């Protein structure tokens, strides 16, 4: 399977449709590219400010000061702080998906190894910059309906990724055991989110390997249960009929 085609929320999902004429060029950079660069600076500034202060304490002035841009350029790309937050969330989620898929592509197709690889990528991404986790795991639930919708779609994307691997590794699981890969996958995503949230709330004080071991336990239990149920199903099929 080509995992490069795994859907993520597009980075331009929150931009308005249609592109303006290129306009004048300065230093070899046209108008659209300059606007894109300013938008990227605001996204990075938003991540830093939201991650440090929290969404509800952050202001347009804080973000513009960090980005070294005037408020005119803020409103060029975002109609509100909520819109900026949604843009930051999309950036964080899309980058995590890309990193996860890249790591999985390099992993052997063995259930335990795949799970550990994906979880390590997730935890390392958080530890590199805990601001990402505050945006994605904590504030996203309180910003508004738009952020909640985007967060929910992102969680579904990661659940679909896990479900895809379950179906590849256990193609007869649903038929033989009644276990639904998408329900199992959503449960695993939920455990990831809760454990990661606790880790972030303690400022990542617990060593990553300890957090990984505890997060991985849910995957090991699911793998063991799936293996046991499949063996039971195979044994039942092998029994002679009367």
Provide a role label for each language-model segment.
Residues 2-19, 176-201, 209-222:
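Hydrophobic alpha-helical segments that form the core
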